[in-house]
A protein has these predicted regions:
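Conserved PLP-enzyme active-site core in the AAT-like
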Residues: 2, 8-17, 79-311
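Short Gly/Pro-enriched turn/cap motifs at secondary-structure boundaries
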Residues: 18-20, 210, 273, 334-336, ...
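A generic secondary-structure signal marking the coil-to-beta-strand transition
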Residues: 8, 24-28, 51, 78, ...
């Protein structure tokens, strides 16, 4: 694949690169196993001495092609797909954290992520301190501890629609020798590429805009390849010291910039197994092929709806960074000048019953537990 292609081209062309006589459309490789002619070749695959496929719980050609497409869209060195966005955020953090470690995260994140970091990971011995992302750098810095391993935030928060100051968060993270992980689900790489602003690792719930049709659940983790794990090797022993389960292999030494992704695949996916089905990845790829077109229209639609709601006296407040009087307008213009996403947060004048009456009166707009697909929902 040529370098410096437009993101619209990458949506269609990246990932699956058919050879002479191969299917033009990404095929669904619906197989758990892969045949080899001799045991030596299989042994080399098991020991990570050769690239290839041997069991779909780790890697599969369909999944791999879609992961490569998402990595290309974000401008990363590699990616791994997961069975959900929740799995992606868990794996992204757990790949570099263990019992006794600490993370710092924005408190403006998806509720499921808040519970994952604040409740579930605590049971695994990983503590989290949540911070106000709009606070000054000194206040956020105060949350860091000697055992802090990650700083986490969302480009556009779910559901509050706050915009993260990625450059500020990157400065703080790197000052403390840790990576910045950003969930880029709402913005997508069409509207924002966090790596261009200092972020190190990006996650996605591909269930949302990337799929775009509410047809599959999935997630993705993309590594920029820019974070120097060995500069603070004592913080990241899982990456920078030998892995006994692979005969003393060291991920950063053996795989270089791909060390983080290789550990995700070879160790965590091997042991925890949150892999998407090849069929789900095929559906995701179909959605990605039109992502650049859909995001343009989503943003146009959302802008018009936000302006309508903003001017309606029955509406108490609207959060959408495309509005000039929105608190995050300047950050939105900085990081997403062509539009943020199609999600709007707003409140009505009245009480809970007012909100219920409004929702129950909707005709074309559906009440669902979802956001960010082709059909307007609430």
């Amino acid at each position: 694949m040529k370098k410096n292609l437009k993101r619209s081209t990458l949506c269609v062309q990246a990932g699956w690169e058919p050879k002479n006589g191969d299917p033009r459309v990404l095929p669904i490789i619906q197989s758990t196993t892969f045949k080899y002619d001799n045991s030596e070749e299989m042994a080399m695959l098991f020991d990570l001495k050769k690239e290839g496929y041997f069991y779909t719980r780790l890697q599969n050609p369909t999944n791999d092609a879609v992961a490569k497409k998402i990595a290309a869209l974000e401008g990363g060195v590699g990616a791994m797909l997961t069975s959900s966005g929740q799995a992606a955020n868990f794996y992204a953090v757990f790949n570099i954290c263990e019992a006794g470690d600490h993370i710092v995260a924005s408190n403006e994140v998806y509720g499921g992520t808040y519970n994952l970091f604040g409740v579930t990971m605590k049971k695994l011995g990983i503590e989290c301190t949540f911070v106000n992302p709009d606070a000054d750098e000194e206040e956020i810095q105060a949350a860091f501890k000697p055992n802090t391993k990650v700083l986490f935030g969302e480009t556009v928060s779910n559901p509050g629609c706050n915009v993260l100051d990625i450059e500020k968060f990157a400065r703080i993270a790197h000052k403390n020798g840790v990576p910045l992980i950003v969930d880029n689900t709402f913005a997508t790489p069409i509207n924002c590429r966090p790596f261009e602003w200092g972020c190190d690792i990006v996650t996605h719930s591909t269930t949302k805009y990337m799929d775009g049709h509410a047809s599959q659940i999935g997630g993705a983790i993309v590594d920029s390849g820019n974070f120097d794990w060995n500069a603070n090797a004592e913080k990241f022993p899982g990456l920078c010291t030998p892995d006994d389960s692979y005969h003393g292999l060291t991920y950063t030494k053996t795989f270089g910039k791909m060390g983080y992704i290789q550990k995700l695949v070879a160790q965590l996916m091997r042991d925890l197994g949150s892999i998407p089905s090849p069929h789900n990845s095929f559906l995701l790829n179909m959605g990605l092929e039109t992502l650049h077109l859909r995001m343009q229209q989503h943003c146009k639609n959302a802008q018009r709806v936000a302006e309508f709601l903003h001017d309606d006296p029955r509406v108490a407040w609207v959060h959408f960074c495309g509005l000039k009087d929105d608190k995050f307008y300047s950050l939105g213009q900085k990081y997403m000048p062509n539009g943020s996403c199609g999600v709007i947060a707003f409140g009505l004048n009245g009480d809970r019953d007012t909100a219920i009456k409004f929702m129950d009166s909707l005709e074309m707009i559906a009440i669902v537990t979802h956001v960010a697909d082709a059909r307007t929902c609430v």
